[in-house]
C-alpha cells in the first residue's frame, strides 16, 4: 500500500504497519526485487513509467520506490541485424518453477523497449509471428540487451542461466526504541481484539462432537470446521439443513473445494450445489468434475438452479445443443480488461461476456447436467467427458485435438523428488509465447508447491500435439537460481521421452561467524531452559521467529510443505519464539502439519538472540525470522533475516550435505 505524503509516494506495511512510513516487514527483502508494479484505476499522469493502459486502469512501475534501479533497453533484431518493430518483449523472472512474465512490452520502430529494473538478472523472451529469441539481461553489469529472433517455432533448442537477484544492503534500525514500544502496544491491543474473535471459532473437539451428532466422519468434519475459521457457522448450518441422506454428498463437497472456500462461502451457496436429482455418484469423475462448483478461480456462487432454468427454457437436453446455445452468447473481451470472471448467472442475464466467463459458464452448465467438464489443464479450453474421451469444444465445431504422450525421466539426486511449480514446469509454445500448463497444482496449500515428479510421472502424461518447453530451476542459498530451458515436441499418437536436468547447487560453505555452542532455550511445555543439542556431524538450523508475522508464516509454510523431506533427513531443527508472548499467540492449527524433527521453544530474556547477534556481528536484530545454520563448533555457514523465497529448500540443501 502506498500513500502520497509531502509530494512523494511512500509505502506502509499493509496489514502489519510499522511506526514510520517506508518501513515494513519487507523493507530488507524488497531490496532484492527486480520489478515492482502498482495498478492504478483509470489514467495515471505521474512521473513513473507506465507499462500498460487499458479501459479500467494503468500499470505503474514503482520499483524505484523500494530498491536501487537502472534504466534498461532491449533491442530486438532479425537474423539480418535489422530492428524488428512491434515485437512482443516479455521480461521474465524465474518463480514457482517457471519463467514468469512480469512485464510485456512491444518494440518501437527502432526495435527497442525500455524498462527500469532492479540491479539483478532478468530473462527476456521476444517473439513476433513464428520467430522468437531470448537472452539474459544482467542489469548490474549492462543496461542494454540485444535479442535476435533467430529461432522458429518448431526448432529444438536449450539453454542454461545463473539468474542472480539484486544484492541486499544492510540497513540500520529505521525507528527508535520509543517508537517501537508504542507500536508494539498497538499490536498487542489489535491482537487482543483479534484473539477474542478467534476464540469463538469451533475447535477440533467441538467439531468432532457435532460430527457424531450428524453421523459423519469425525476426523474429516472436524478438520473442515477448524479450516473454516470464522465461517464455521455457515458450514454448520449447511450440514444441519442438508437432507440426512445427502450428508455424504455434502461432506464430499466440503472435501473438494479449496480451503479458502471453506472460509468464505455462505451456507446457501453450498446447499444449492447438493440439491437436484439425477446425480451419477458412481461416475469416477463425479466429485471433481460434476459436484465441484469451482471451475477456475472465480467466486463460488449458487448457479445450478438458474442454469437448470436456462437449459429448460432453451430445450437443451444434451451436450450438442448446449454447445450450440453457448455459441450464441456474444463475446466482447474488450469490455472486460480486469479479467474478473462473470458468474454463470451473470452470463445468462446479460447474454454478453468475455471468452473466459463463457467457458466457465459452459463447464458449469455441463456439471449441472451431470456431464463431467473442466477447463483443460493443458490448453485452458473447455472440455467435457463422454464415452471414455475428453472432448475439446470451440463452440463452432466439436473438435477432438490430436494428442500424444510425454514421459519425463529424472535419474539425478540433485533434488530427491522435484516439485511442480517449484523445481519444474512444462509450457506449451503458442504463437511465440509460452503458456504454462497445470500438471499438479495444490490449491489447498497457501502459496504452496504442486505435486511431485514421482506423483505426476508414474506413467506418461497425455498432452496435445505441439511444441513445448521444460523449465527447471534450483535456488541457491544466496537467492540465485540455476535455471534451464529445453524445447521438445509432442507428436500425435507417439511417446516423447525427455531427460529432465536440475543442476546441483554447489554452495559456498564459508564460515560467516562463530557463535557460542552453549546455547539454550525453554522447550515447549517446560519452564526451565535446556541446552540446544548441536549435531556431532553436519549442520542444524536455529530459527528465531515471531507469531502472526508474514515473513515467519512464509518460512513455516515452507517447512510444512517439505514435511516428508525433513523427516527423512532426521536432523533436529530448532524453532524458537522471540519471547513467551509470541509463543502464546502462535496457533499451530493455522498451518498444515510440521516435520516431527522441529523442536519448538522460547528464547529466555533474549539470550539466544544476543548470543547469535554478537557472534555474527548483526547490526539489526529486529528483522525476523533469523535463521542460522551451524555445526557442533558453532561455525555458521548460512544466515538469513526477514523474508526470503524458498527458505525451506535452502535449509535442506545445506543440512543434507554429507
List the predicted regions and their residue ranges.
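Thiol-/selenol-based redox modules, centered on thioredoxin-like
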Residues: 623-658
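Short, internal strand/loop/helix patches
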Residues: 587-624
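Short active-site neighborhood of thiol/selenol oxidoreductases, capturing the structured segment around
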Residues: 531-555, 559, 572-575
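Hydrophobic/aromatic-rich core segments of domains that either
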Residues: 1-48, 123-124, 312-315, 321-325, ...
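Short, acidic Ser/Thr/Gly-rich low-complexity loop/linker segments typical of extracellular
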Residues: 95-116, 432-458
